[in-house]
Amino acid sequence: MPQWGVVRVAYTLEQCWHEVPGGTARAALEVAAELHAGSVLDLVGVSALHRHPPAPPWVPPIPVRQLALPRLALYEAWHLMRRPAVQRATGPVDLIHATGVAVPPHSAPLVLTVHDLAYLHDPAQFTAKGRRFFNQALRLWRSDADLVLCSSAATLADCAAAGLPKRKLRLVPLGVREVRIAPGEVATTLARYGLERPFVLSVGTLEPRKNLPTLIEAFAQIARNDVDLVLVGASGWHTQVDELVRPLGNRVRVLGFLPNADRDALYAGAEVFCYPSLFEGFGLPVLEAMAAGTPVVTSLGTATAEAAGDAAVLVDPRSVAQVTAALDRVLGSEALANELKEAGRERAALFQWSTTAELTLEAYAELLA
């Protein structure tokens, strides 16, 4: 822990108000909670103008000061005019930490968190407006950031390849909380959602890079016909889930976004967690499933493999046959499933939010020394 007097940090939290906050908001909130629990920081959140606080579970654990512009206008002003300063909302600060994509103007040292560069990997999945916004942000990442915190080695490599100075990049992996739920509570939750049969689970925003067509086609070909597929996550874009699952009838359940406690119970109750994503900056759901003691099947060649280590069955996410074979292996072997459960819990235990916060503090200390 760095030894300072109290340091005031402006910490952007606008993603908590997004229609689909997702993993980036969860990471920002978890780190904020850990940093706030210490005594060395006066951490103050920054957001655009909103009439209401974000909905649970996205309520920040720190006070949030709002600037006088709605989100889109604020981002345009930040990127094109380099104003307004966050200090207009927060007062004087010693450091600014931008936890989302947008880059605020700064007279204090600026830390950025970058989770992924998905739009560079598959720009066709983004609108022209979205690509323009990300290109503006990337230009400012290169020119304005004093340090850039990357959630995986894969993201760090992508940042370097995109022209961010290597000397400014720091690896700061995300964390995961241990999931321990009583069997009775799991059973109650499953019953409430009408999940009466064994099931394969996938969790994540329903968007193209999650590779749902491959997952659904692979599931349709598994050997066991007494197993269902459960999809959990907010609706994203360009994915017609209902059309994909219609041929499988009631063997596929699409539950949408769930409260954290219910989601964790489904992790714990699943036979296997399958996450054949085409691209991830970290792959937090993989570690969440492992923390719940659930066997994992996930993708080679993405940051999910980096997160999973040797504790998952890894597949080519573009191969329906490989995904089907992996599901059959885990569903057909109690010994393999138990081995993956134990290995997964051990792997997840290596990723702690307290460590993420400590590494974040070290980055702050570099700039404030």
Locate predicted features.
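Carbohydrate transferase catalytic cores enriched for Leloir-type hexosyltransferases
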Residues: M1-A369
